[in-house]
């Protein structure tokens, strides 16, 4: 029993010393870490998604952005993009019904204007 208490005490002390060492090492590394973060391009953190909501009336450009295709894409590409996105965001599998409606609206708009 006494040896267990001593072992636990030594383990806690070792963890404390290790934590103290890590904190001191971090203080010395702080300028280097700041320099690395400043040298990274700003676009790395800006996100690769469209910043903005939906237009009240969907445009051809917005529909193309939603499906991730060119505004002049043919029906085959539009259908493939629609299928891929709906598999990821179907309401029956936890996706948003609103987003699914917008995806369907985008497909309908682009297919109405697309070539066969």
From Swiss-Prot:
Alphabetical list of Gene3D superfamilies matching this protein: DnaJ domain
InterPro entries: DnaJ_domain, J_dom_sf
Sequence ranges on the Mitochondrial intermembrane membrane side: 2-3
Ranges where the J domain occurs: 62-116
GO BP of this protein: genitalia development; intracellular protein transport; protein folding; protein import into mitochondrial matrix; protein targeting to mitochondrion; regulation of cardiolipin metabolic process; visual perception
Expression sites (tissue/organ): Ubiquitously expressed.
Residues exposed to the Mitochondrial matrix side: 25-116
Compartment(s) where it occurs, according to its Swiss-Prot or TrEMBL record: Mitochondrion inner membrane
GO molecular function: ATPase activator activity
Keywords: Acetylation, Cardiomyopathy, Chaperone, Membrane, Mitochondrion, Mitochondrion inner membrane, Phosphoprotein, Protein transport, Translocation, Transmembrane, Transmembrane helix, Transport
Known role: Mitochondrial co-chaperone which forms a complex with prohibitins to regulate cardiolipin remodeling. May be a component of the PAM complex, a complex required for the translocation of transit peptide-containing proteins from the inner membrane into the mitochondrial matrix in an ATP-dependent manner. May act as a co-chaperone that stimulate the ATP-dependent activity.
Modified residues (Phosphoserine): 39, 70
Gene Ontology CC terms, in alphabetical order: inner mitochondrial membrane protein complex; matrix side of mitochondrial inner membrane; membrane; mitochondrial inner membrane; mitochondrion; PAM complex, Tim23 associated import motor; protein-containing complex; TIM23 mitochondrial import inner membrane translocase complex
Protein name, per record: Mitochondrial import inner membrane translocase subunit TIM14
Membrane topology type: Single-pass membrane protein
Disease: 3-methylglutaconic aciduria 5: An autosomal recessive disorder characterized by early-onset dilated cardiomyopathy, growth failure, cerebellar ataxia causing significant motor delays, testicular dysgenesis, growth failure and significant increases in urine organic acids, particularly 3-methylglutaconic acid and 3-methylglutaric acid.
